[in-house]
Amino acid sequence: MNLHEYQGKQLFAEYGLPVSKGFAVDTPEAAAEACDKIGGSEWVVKAQVHAGGRGKAGGVKLVRSKEDAKAFAAQWLGKRLVTYQTDANGQPVTKILVESCTDIAKELYLGAVVDRSSRRIVFMASTEGGVDIEKVAHETPEKIIKATIDPLVGAQPFQGRELAFQLGLEGKQVAQFAKIFVGLAKLFKEHDLALLEVNPLVIKADGDLHCLDAKINIDANAMYRQPKLKTFHDPSQDDPREAHAASFELNYVALEGNIGCMVNGAGLAMGTMDIVNLHGGKPANFLDVGGGATKERVTEAFKIILSDSNVAAVLVNIFGGIVRCDMIAEGIIGAVKEVGVKVPVVVRLEGNNAELGAKVLAESGLNIIAATSLTDAAQQVVKAAEGK
């Protein structure tokens, strides 16, 4: 689950980290009032969406009057912001963050992720702040320095100081960086985060360090023990199809291709998408119906897949382990009849009662193409999507 910038900064402040004074507002009038509360003569106004690239899309602006802040809020509230990280429809703007202006002398990067290879939290820092860390990692990987956190003792101040020295910080900045580093590590662990970024972490004109941005992603599997963070969820930022799928315990991620995929098991789903790509097709989605697939869930899965108007064919790839293939076949037939599927459907069944499942499909009288292997399934669905 992603948090908005203002929510991330709220957590930063609770851990004693330096952030700008600001207020999240949902009306133009409140934006003007926020300027009065903050004081000063310059403010930064930011549209709050779960996507990067807001500045280039016009979603971040420096304003020098309350009227300009009010006008910015009126311009964006209730509208959709399109950035390079969103689709063509963009993300809805329901909040504007109004905060004090910061004089920036230098921009740095500081972030943390769970590294699966070492099975530990790894912090990354760089002098290349304000740009995508993925771009830095690709073009100049030597500019990224790392610190691995021992899960038994946690982040240590000396690790923060080592990173600070490698970043070229000096004097009071070293102690400030170490404090930010330890605070972020504590926040990461205590709130079950999957990703945390401060980009940029800036050196102000007076030499002090300051967290100018906050990007936080929480591990969805740990949300049951984070009741406070559950209240931070903004459903307006969710893909409606993904939200609908989650209500039926279906794991769905929308993509940009034209071949719908319905698979049981996340690993098999990834492999299915790979082989579709290998044979020249483009998956329209990732959809894992799970090990306990039922007729109802298969029906909902079809509805969700076909809600994407780009889908020209559907590939159903099921491995019968706990679940029987003949039961899945009956579910597919029932779903095709109920939903009124008008695109070609290719089905590959393997495992428990696979032969019986194939027989059930063959005797259904429906336009369902039975595949003999995963390769055959991929080739058939690509042809079907192309109208061949």
UniProtKB/Swiss-Prot annotation:
It catalyses: succinate + ATP + CoA = succinyl-CoA + ADP + phosphate; GTP + succinate + CoA = succinyl-CoA + GDP + phosphate. GO terms for molecular function: ATP binding; magnesium ion binding; succinate-CoA ligase (ADP-forming) activity; succinate-CoA ligase (GDP-forming) activity. ATP binds at K46, G53, R54, G55, E99, T102, E107. Substrate binds at N264, G321, I322, V323. SUPFAM superfamilies: Glutathione synthetase ATP-binding domain-like, Succinyl-CoA synthetase domains. The keyword Repressor does not apply. Pfam families: ATP-grasp_2 (PF08442), Ligase_CoA (PF00549). Belongs to the succinate/malate CoA ligase beta subunit family. Mg(2+) binds at N199, D213. The gene is sucC. PANTHER family: SUCCINATE--COA LIGASE [GDP-FORMING] SUBUNIT BETA, MITOCHONDRIAL, SUCCINYL-COA SYNTHETASE BETA CHAIN. One of its GO terms (biological process) is tricarboxylic acid cycle. HAMAP family: Succ_CoA_beta. It is an enzyme of class 6 (ligase). This is Succinate--CoA ligase [ADP-forming] subunit beta. Binds 1 Mg(2+) ion per subunit. The lineage of its organism: Bacteria, Pseudomonadati, Pseudomonadota, Gammaproteobacteria, Pseudomonadales. Succinyl-CoA synthetase functions in the citric acid cycle (TCA), coupling the hydrolysis of succinyl-CoA to the synthesis of either ATP or GTP and thus represents the only step of substrate-level phosphorylation in the TCA. The beta subunit provides nucleotide specificity of the enzyme and binds the substrate succinate, while the binding sites for coenzyme A and phosphate are found in the alpha subunit. InterPro entries: ATP-grasp (IPR011761), ATP-grasp_succ-CoA_synth-type (IPR013650), ATP_grasp_subdomain_1 (IPR013815), Succ-CoA_synthase_bsu_CS (IPR017866), SUCC_ACL_C (IPR005811), Succ_CoA_ligase-like_bsu (IPR005809), Succinyl-CoA_synth-like (IPR016102). Keywords: ATP-binding, Ligase, Magnesium, Metal-binding, Nucleotide-binding, Tricarboxylic acid cycle. Residues 9-244 form the ATP-grasp domain.
